[in-house]
């Protein structure tokens, strides 16, 4: 088991919906600090108390203050760990999940493997594809644009994944 660090802001009202927020890479729960209170207590910001969420924002395994896995794990295993956090540790019957960047990949696996407990996901990064690939000309054109976009914007990921110390010298 991995020790998990997370923010757990109980929402206002009688029945707030549990919402799991997952950060990206290289990121942290700091990405969510400005929205947690707004999601948990919408009535303080002109919203309706009935729209409140119990917000759970974990540091992903190996990130921030969460424990480090003893061996490398991928997004599917992280999805299982986070589902366990929500269902077994925090004792929610069901929840919603949101993820961006690496968190989106994990959210996809939560939605795929844990749909009994996770009722919906929201992602802001496309990571999973249909196993048979593009089906139409429009999808093929989108895939080509997406692949080109990845080439043009992927340098940071390659640099950080293969030579992370290099970037630290520029920060000194």
Regions found by a protein language model. Name each.
Residues 1-172:
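Catalytic cores of eukaryotic secretory-pathway lumenal/extracellular enzymes that build
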